A protein has these predicted regions:
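C-terminal hydrophobic helical "lid"/dimerization subdomain
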Residues: 32, 251-255, 294-344
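NAD(P)H dinucleotide-binding glycine-rich loop of Rossmann-like/cofactor-binding domains
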Residues: 55, 92-175
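Local beta-strand N-terminus motif with an aromatic residue
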Residues: 83, 123, 169, 214, ...
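Mid-domain Rossmann-like dinucleotide-binding core that forms the NAD(H)/NADP(H) cofactor-binding site
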Residues: 138-222, 226-227
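Glycine-rich cofactor phosphate-binding loops and adjacent beta1-alpha1 units
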Residues: 163-168, 207-287
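Residues in the short beta-alpha loop(s) of Rossmann-like NAD(P)-binding domains
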Residues: 202, 269, 292
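Rossmann-fold dehydrogenase core element
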Residues: 262-264, 274-314
């Protein structure tokens, strides 16, 4: 089969012929990839930022946002059958450890992360687990929802954490209206009554945010802090949901949050630099967000089937992966990049 593999950090990916994955365990599921989402994490992987944390050996196949059709199943799989359309939760959890029992799939003590620490979905086929596949509504196609497996899952996971502080009359600032942010806006609109303020340097992204139901669009041109202060009566927002986490976003977010506010960190790339006395005196809470749970993904698919969440995408054939990554890195993508294998 074909797979786009990383052979050396900072190099372009290569389209290789590799052996097909095989069923080895009773809960294994092999998915024929219909679409794979392109994530900024894939750029960070290419740059070597995940090398030490993942411990993966090169060459390997990235790709952690995947959807397609069940190709083959292990002997104990009962929740899906060959031919079913599925979206793949990006993490394979054991289901038996303490975090799994608590519903914290992403912190499984025995888990693995296809596309991060083992071969992922930039390929014709992907091996995953019965615990990771969500059967899709018949009206949903892989190319339309693949990136929800991480981008959407991460967005809804953060929004669900913020629900308790986003009651009527509250305000939330969304930093970044791109691949993750535009999904987060829709989740906020569907799940909370909060007033949504979106900050982004791109007028196209802000126009999309307006279409998706955001209340205020603020151009990140140097005046954003002053404008957000005016929109929040000088007090700041109850919550910041930061889908950028670099290029000055953290500093902006800290300036836009009200006392006793909650800062949800999703994007990454720079450090959180704030004096501890400010954290204490202002009672600001910083909350990290790593993807989401299986149940989060199931709920997101329900919202999608109801038409409350729509993924805006640009598609590329798998063999054009380096063009797609260049477009992502250059800020030319609106919404999410989607790779389509020739076998889809």
């Amino acid at each position: 089969m074909k797979a786009a593999r990383l052979h050396a950090y900072h190099d372009a990916l290569r389209l290789d012929d590799v052996p097909e994955p095989r069923i080895e365990g009773p809960l294994d599921v092999i998915v024929r990839i219909g679409a794979a989402g392109l994530c900024r994490t894939d750029l960070h992987i290419q740059e070597g930022q995940w090398a030490e944390k993942s411990g993966v050996a090169l060459p390997y196949t990235p790709g952690h946002e995947n959807a397609g059709w069940v190709h083959e199943v292990g002997s104990a799989v009962s929740n899906v059958q060959v031919g079913d359309t599925v979206i793949v939760h990006p993490f394979i959890s054991c289901g038996l450890c303490g975090p799994c029992r608590q519903g914290n799939d992403m912190h499984c003590l025995n888990g693995s992360f296809p596309g991060i620490d083992r071969d992922g979905g930039f390929a014709d086929l992907l091996k995953t687990s019965a615990r990771s596949v969500v059967k899709l509504d018949t009206g949903l196609a892989p190319k339309d929802i693949a990136a929800l497996a991480d981008a959407g899952l991460t967005a809804i996971h953060a929004v669900k954490k913020a629900i308790p502080v986003l009651g009527p009359g509250t305000r939330v600032v969304v930093i970044g209206a791109g691949g993750l942010g535009h999904i987060g806006i829709q989740c906020l609109r569907a799940l909370t009554p909060a007033e949504i303020i979106v900050v982004d340097p791109s007028e196209r992204a802000l126009a999309l945010a307006a279409e998706l139901g955001a209340d205020h669009m603020v151009t990140a041109d140097g005046s954003q802090r002053e404008i957000v202060a005016d929109l929040t009566d000088g007090h700041g927002a109850e919550a910041i949901i930061d889908f950028v986490g670099e290029r000055g976003a953290i500093e902006d977010g800290i300036a836009m949050i009200r006392n006793a506010g909650f800062y949800y960190v999703i994007g990454y790339g720079e450090n959180i630099d704030i004096p501890t006395i400010d954290v204490i005196s202002r009672e600001i809470s910083f909350i990290g967000n790593l993807v989401g749970t299986y149940n989060d993904l199931h709920e997101l698919m329900t919202l999608t089937a109801q038409g409350k969440v729509t993924l805006h995408t640009t598609t590329y054939p798998l063999e054009a992966i380096n063009d797609a990554m260049a477009d992502l890195n250059g800020g030319r993508l609106q919404g999410r990049g989607i790779l389509i294998p020739a076998t889809a």
